[in-house]
Amino acid sequence: DVSSPEKLAPDLDRIGFVVNEKIGADTCERCHADIVEQWSKSAHRFASFNNPFYEATINDMREKALSLTKGVAEHVAHFPQWQERTGKIKSKWCSGCHDPSVMLAGQMTETIDRRSPQAQAGLTCLACHAIDQIHNTTGNGNYNIVDEHEDPYVFARAEKGSVGALLHDTAIKAKPEAHKRQMLPPFFRTSEFCSTCHKVSLPESVNDYRWFRGQNEYDNWHDSGVALNASRTFYLPPNKRVCQDCHMPLEPAPLGDVSAKNGMVRSHRFLAVNTALPHVRGDEDTIKRIEAFLRDNRLRIDVFALQRERTEGESETVLALDKTQPSLRTGEKVTFDVVVRNKDVGHTFPGGTNDSNEGWIEFTILDAKDRVLYQSGFV
């Protein structure tokens, strides 16, 4: 399902990227209305040149990362016509997870038309559901995607709204087993499936510096108490949990999604911490959902102790501050011991890209009249 450029123009002219046209989901939406609606608000959907933050970053790389590194030189040796396209070649490293529609159309080494359906598609339904194998857990898009799904049902290529489309959808609903085998193999329910794009490295051939880790949710999860693999953790859930348990929880399906069980589907919002994307498109509902997700008992912060400086080199430790409630005198030097515990984040906090994500603890001291005396971490 590739939308025409004419349908994309209103959004592109208004906000700079496509919001209303659900590129690549037209056929799926006929049976999976709830899932498509959820996906349409997700960070997965806005992963490519329809993400202004990613677009600026990848374009900078394509225009300025011009050094002919060893890996790129070997690439150019096979394709000498790309001698002047080193930045574009390096951007292919990112495209397997951010721009599969552009990559599979063979456009990553070309000048990309950001107004094209491929550039505005993001991660479509088939970007995930056409994957038939994960080679290993090294990440960086190390998956195998089928060349073309052969739809086993009659009138597979019928146009939306036609009698053929109605017969096709009726056949799927009557005998969905073949469709389910194609679109939902067992490994889709594992964290290893997610590792293919949520474990990222940047090798020397890309950054002309050295290998370093860009993101690694998978190994952090694998070695955590949530995966029941950490003997020294202070937190063990009753049962092992995988990525999908937190990021694809059950959600009501009021639009009649045929895959719903007891009125619920696995959410395709993929909620995490990204509030910037919904903010730039004015999606207050998604921002509220993310805030609720993050405030659902994920972390615990305790002001564990107070160190009062008595004389030089000596101090007094005050524990159980909630019970003792010590008062402080003007000019007194104190140190607070604060303990932060990760209770319900299945990987390290904060997660995501290593170079840009930080967490703040807001710590405020008030006087007896609620006047602010000191603040740290206030945003």
Region locations from a protein language model:
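Primarily the internal scaffold of c-type cytochrome electron-transfer domains
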Residues: D1-V19, I35-W82, Q107-V379
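Hydrophobic alpha-helical transmembrane segments
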Residues: G87-G96
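An acidic-aromatic substrate-binding cleft motif
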Residues: E21-A25
